[in-house]
């Protein structure tokens, strides 16, 4: 048999070499590269093995092939337990036993496949407590076939390769029954399917020397002595522009005529680089493989290896094409991942901004996801998108990024501060009852907000809602509010120090100017905010101030007080660009066509500030409290406040249903204001609480 195979191989080599335009075949027969060899350098032909070594290898392969030691014992009595199964199989070494009473089935693992076969013969159709038992091998779905393994791999090296991905039940290489050498593929069965799936993904395309491994699922019923030898060959490393199927068929018909021979094609076009040839028997395929491996076709030295056994040639070719596609794409998605610059440019699209702001606008769900954004992080600062924003925030002043993008990035950094400020006012007035964790220390909020002292709010706040003098008493001192306003951003169309709109009452007109903003702070933000001239200006109120007051004086007072009292734990805020920290006042970046007013409204807007607006809103009573609760961000940075906010949000299931403004607006909003902030503030103050 060995002599016949050798003669056939020599003739096949000569025939294949002649068809390819080469010399005698024996000199062309390589057996493939080793794991240690350099890529493209084939191993020399392995030396002939001693007959005893060949017999030992084949015996080891047969032992592992039949080493299926897991059995099923079916049709057990309903009340059976593991002890009864142990007593039934007391003559065998049980490694594992589990009884499923619902299925009336026992899952048993014995010492080896020999005991499993013996137990099947002994207890199949065995009568046990009036039931005829059904004993059979357990099916497995964790079996893989690994091809393109270097032929120099030993069984120990192959086991080390596959064991890295999980516990294995068995593994073995397939050896030639003629020469005893490895045929370049093997099988591995894992304990769990998860291990097998991981190994398949990791091994697919893994480079070992000049070979790229290929892993695929296998049917356990194919693990039989007459079925594990493959009839299909893969001709790899063909010229990429090779299209001559007739020539390829002629070359591989010199020794034995194949039943299938085709170049790789994907959707009618040639993939290039490899082909599949199928023969009638495994012996014919082995002879051709030995003769053709390492031959040259059109200047390229091809690699001829065995495919996985069991499937016909056409199915094998389709599986190889699919695997080639996966390896070329490096197991990535169909669409490439966008880089940070592309993400930033997409922020100019209102639809993209709306998607990003969706969690912030809709609030937190009643029951947050187990693996969702941490409670201590705002929705827009979750780990999935923060790297791109952190990277792009460094280059946000570039003209390529656009005005809207820069505004959006700045607002992201201001959201936590706005949450702290609004939550402070809510806890002072609307939260008369102590929280579940007690009252938070005032020093924490003061330090985080950069405010030197507690805002001097009077105790009678909220008892007499309609009195103007109560509202005026809520205005803090000049130094305190100026320090607080150092943390609050403004838009460029707002008045600077000493420029405020006309008052609503004589009482308010008599109040001194307490809030100012340095004009120089707006110089850096002008290019980025010109597209938002009407945004949120009308809803921000400050103590009214006569226009005759000198502008430089107010500027000096404001900037001096802010520099003395800003001692934030988070560091100094950016001074060049100051934007609104309230996410609800920045909706123009999401819906510019709805939020932005006509250009004519620029001249009629009354410029105001946010601190007095919040204080006046608090003095309005219960409805103002509801409005402030809806303005509060739903993911505050501090855990103490997250408790209160979450409890209130659980009671409130309504969405933000915006109604048209009605006549007789509340006192804290100017009747002539046309800005978006005024519109939303009016709506919030009028809405009723919905449970």
From Swiss-Prot:
The function of this protein is: May bind single-stranded nucleic acids.
Which species does this protein come from? Homo sapiens (Human)
Instruction: State the oligomer form and interacting partners.
Output: Interacts with PTBP1 and RAVER1.
Entry-annotated residues carrying N-acetylalanine: 2
Please give the PROSITE patterns that the UniProt record associates with this protein: RRM
Q: Pfam families from the xrefs?
A: RRM_1 (PF00076)
Q: Name one GO cellular component term.
A: cytoplasm
**Compositional bias of type Polar residues: which residue ranges?**
548-569
Supply the name of the protein. Answer: Ribonucleoprotein PTB-binding 2
Region called Disordered, residue ranges: 1-47, 492-522, 543-574
Q: GO MF terms on file?
A: RNA binding
Record key words, sorted: Acetylation, Cytoplasm, Nucleus, Repeat, RNA-binding
**Subcellular localization:** Nucleus; Cytoplasm
Answer yes or no on keyword Acetylation: yes
């Amino acid at each position: 048999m060995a002599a016949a195979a050798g003669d056939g191989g020599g003739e096949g080599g000569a025939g294949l070499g002649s068809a390819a335009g080469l010399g005698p075949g024996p000199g062309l027969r390589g057996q493939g590269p080793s794991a240690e060899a350099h890529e493209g350098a084939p191993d020399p032909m392995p030396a002939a093995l001693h007959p005893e070594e060949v017999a030992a290898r084949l015996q080891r392969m047969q032992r592992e092939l039949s080493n299926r030691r897991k059995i099923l014992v079916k049709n057990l009595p309903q009340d059976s337990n593991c002890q009864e199964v142990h007593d039934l199989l007391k003559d065998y070494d049980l490694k594992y036993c589990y009884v499923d009473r619902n299925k009336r089935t026992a899952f048993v693992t014995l010492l080896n496949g020999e005991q499993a076969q013996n137990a099947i013969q002994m207890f199949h159709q065995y009568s046990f407590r009036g039931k005829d038992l059904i004993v059979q091998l357990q099916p497995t779905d964790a079996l893989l076939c690994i091809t393109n393994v270097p032929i120099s791999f030993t069984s120990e090296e192959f086991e080390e390769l596959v064991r890295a991905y999980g516990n294995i039940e068995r593994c073995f290489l397939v050896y030639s029954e003629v020469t005893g050498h490895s045929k370049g593929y093997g099988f591995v069965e894992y304990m769990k399917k998860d291990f097998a799936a991981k190994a398949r993904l990791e091994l697919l395309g893994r480079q070992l020397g000049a070979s790229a491994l290929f892993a695929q699922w296998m049917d356990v019923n194919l693990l039989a002595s007459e079925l594990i030898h493959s009839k299909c060959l893969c001709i790899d490393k063909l010229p990429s522009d090779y299209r001559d199927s007739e020539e390829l068929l002629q070359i591989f018909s010199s020794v034995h005529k194949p039943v299938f021979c085709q170049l790789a094609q994907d959707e009618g076009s040639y993939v290039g680089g490899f082909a599949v040839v199928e023969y009638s028997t495994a012996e014919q395929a082995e002879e051709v493989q030995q003769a053709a491996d390492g031959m040259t076709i059109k200047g390229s030295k091809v690699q001829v290896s065995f495919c996985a056994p069991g499937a016909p040639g056409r199915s094998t070719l389709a599986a190889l094409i699919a695997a080639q596609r996966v390896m070329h794409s490096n197991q990535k998605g169909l669409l490439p991942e966008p880089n940070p610059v592309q993400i930033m440019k997409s922020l100019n699209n209102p639809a993209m901004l709306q998607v990003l702001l969706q969690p912030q606008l809709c609030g937190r769900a009643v029951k947050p996801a187990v693996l969702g954004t941490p409670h201590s992080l705002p929705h827009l600062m979750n780990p999935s998108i923060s790297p791109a924003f952190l990277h792009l925030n460094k280059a946000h002043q570039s003209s390529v990024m656009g005005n809207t993008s820069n505004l959006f990035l700045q607002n992201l950094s201001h959201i936590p501060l706005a949450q702290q400020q609004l939550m402070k006012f809510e806890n002072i007035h609307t939260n008369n009852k102590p929280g579940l964790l007690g009252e938070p220390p005032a020093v924490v909020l003061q330090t985080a907000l950069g405010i030197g002292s507690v805002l001097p709010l009077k105790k009678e706040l909220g008892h007499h809602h309609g009195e103007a003098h109560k509202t005026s008493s809520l205005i803090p001192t000049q130094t305190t509010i100026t320090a607080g306003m150092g943390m609050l951003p403004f838009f460029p169309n707002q008045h600077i120090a000493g420029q405020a709109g006309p008052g609503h009452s004589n009482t308010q007109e008599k109040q001194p100017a307490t809030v100012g903003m340095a004009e120089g702070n707006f110089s850096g933000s002008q290019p980025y905010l010109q597209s938002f001239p009407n945004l949120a200006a009308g809803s921000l109120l400050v103590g009214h101030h006569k226009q005759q007051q000198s502008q430089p004086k107010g500027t000096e007072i404001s900037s001096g007080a802010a520099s003395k009292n800003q001692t934030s734990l988070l560091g100094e805020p950016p001074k060049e660009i100051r934007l609104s920290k309230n996410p609800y006042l920045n909706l123009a970046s999401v819906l510019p066509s709805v939020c932005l007013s006509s250009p004519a409204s620029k001249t009629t807007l009354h410029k105001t500030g946010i601190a007095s607006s919040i204080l006046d809103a608090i003095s309005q009573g219960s409805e103002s409290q509801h409005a402030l609760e809806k303005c509060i961000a739903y993911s505050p940075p501090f855990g103490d406040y997250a408790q209160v906010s979450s409890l209130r949000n659980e009671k409130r299931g309504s969405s933000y249903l915006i109604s048209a403004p009605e006549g007789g607006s509340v006192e804290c909003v100017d009747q002539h204001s046309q800005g978006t902030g005024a519109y939303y503030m009016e709506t919030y103050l009028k809405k009723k609480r919905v449970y």
